[in-house]
Amino acid sequence: MAEKDKYRPLANFPSTAWGCSFASFSSSNSDFELYTREVETLKEKVRPMVTASTKDPLENVQIINLLYRLGVSYHFENEITDQLNHIFEIIPNHIISDDNDYDLYTVAILFQILRQYGHKVPCDVFNKFKNSDGKFKKSIANDLKGLLSLYEASFLSVHGENILDEAIAFTRPLLESFADQSSPHLAKYIRNSLLRPHHQGIQRVEARQYISFYEEDESRNETLLKFAKLDFNRLQLLHKQELASLSRYKKYIAQIIIWEDLNLAKELPYIRDRLVETYLWAIGAHFEPQYALSRAIIAKYTTIVSAVDDTYDAYGTLDELQRFTNAFQRCDIDAIDELPDYMKVLYRALLNFFDQIEDEVDEGRSYSTSVAKEAFKELVRSYYVEAQWFSDGYVPSFDEYMRNGLITSTYTVLPAASFIGMENTVGEKEYKWVQSNPKIVKAAKIICRLMDDITTHEDEQKRGHCASSIECYMKEYGVSEKKAIEEIQKICANAWKDMNEECMKKPPTVSRTLLKYYVNLARVIDFVYKNLDSYTYASSLKGDITTVFLELLPV
């Protein structure tokens, strides 16, 4: 065996920031039921606010915006859809006309909420805030509320909407200046928005931040605030129960999936032990109670996929990786004898995962586990391609790298498995749609692959790794690292526009729930990989995990 085939690119990843913190958590069903009763009581008080007919549709939109930002709009999806369908019929032409007296904040909120729910309000609505020379009017430069709303709304742009790109460039420096001069409370809110606009943030994290901000608003609606707090605490309790169950590797709380005792971190000390972070990934995909099974699948499967990724990237020799790749193409327990002992743990975990899922799927849905298995076979083949590239010192073209990299993004394998827990949303038609690699699915993979590369490539190159998209771009186009990153960030921005475009397509190809799922996957990546590899250096997520999973809101 050649010496290069025996090389181990050890990473020495940081240990878990949580240990067994969540395993000891326990609560009775009565706690959750008590919260649920209180939430249901307040929900009936809030419902008339959503369904009320008003002379000015702005009042309805402002309530919907509040519900959305406070994280409770999921309770009223049908009512909100009906309201916005009606508003969209009457609003666009009115707000485009020059004779309306809507200010910047009003226009931006109408634009943002309608687009958020799939209605493509034309970007021309912002022309009234420009001078004849095409520049934004100086008169709006002191309107903090309007500037923030314009900034947030601009991230719902699609291709060709230059005015929204200009709006981001116009508002950002002004908002940075406001942040420097504002009270600590307001400055924090502005800086959170500048770091990550609401449209690109994880919904639970965004809701927690906004509840704290709204609590300081003198014009706050006390009923809405209490409703949001109680519902946040209710969901936190549910999520904490799920996480505790996962942490103990015992029977899943809904008694649907049973996991054997399997401590991957103990058996495979070189991997990143990130169960808590993978569960954050799961609630980022969907936090609502009805998706408990899908969350369990995402968290457990991501833990296993992460261990396989670390094996290919940071431990396995080329010979061992080839054996593992070949073994999983058979997907048979008999192939385990061909593997070194440490790989047998991973291989057995994978087969157990698929066996347990297969036992639980409803009759007529066996195709779902077949799709998940085939996706994983493709993933390990692509992981092995990267290992070969590194071993051979080969730097592919950017396009060749991306063809393989969209697969190693894991945004094919993770949805394929998590859909098993979404049977009311994802059927055979939806699986076929996903396999056709539509624009929104490809965009989520692009964002995942490239944002990951931007923050991880330096560490990976130091320890030994195949060229990332950054190195491939630098070599192909003869540019600096800084320039390559700038161009790749533009590709990510365009991918977001692709996602927005797909979400506003009429009629929609698939349900809004499924479209939102892919937007949420992109949001998770932005949260985890913006400016830092927070999956590897997970202590950076500790504050957000604490507020989302551990700290109850005082009511």
From Swiss-Prot:
Keyword presence, Transmembrane: no
Gene Ontology process terms (BP): diterpenoid biosynthetic process; hydrocarbon biosynthetic process
Short sequence motif DDXXD motif: positions: 309-313
MF terms (GO), sorted A to Z: magnesium ion binding; terpene synthase activity
Positions bound to Mg(2+) 3: 460
The keyword Lyase is annotated on this UniProt entry: yes
Cofactor annotation comment: Binds 3 Mg(2+) ions per subunit.
A Pfam family annotated for this UniProt entry: Terpene_synth_C
EC identifiers of the protein: 4.2.3.-
InterPro entries: Isoprenoid_synthase_dom_sf, Terpene_cyclase-like_1_C, Terpene_cyclase_plant_C1, Terpene_synth_N, Terpene_synth_N_sf, Terpene_synthase-like, Terpene_synthase_metal-bd, Terpenoid_cyclase/PrenylTrfase
Binding, Mg(2+) 1: 309, 313
Binding site for Mg(2+) 2: 309, 313
Organism superkingdom: Eukaryota
Obligatory cofactor(s): Mg(2+)
Keywords assigned: Lyase, Magnesium, Metal-binding
Function: Probable sesquiterpene synthase.
Extra remark: Does not produce any detectable product when tested in vitro.
UniProt free text on domains: The Asp-Asp-Xaa-Xaa-Asp/Glu (DDXXD/E) motif is important for the catalytic activity, presumably through binding to Mg(2+).
Family statement: Belongs to the terpene synthase family.
Name this protein carries in UniProt: Probable terpene synthase 6
Classification lineage: Eukaryota, Viridiplantae, Streptophyta, Embryophyta, Tracheophyta
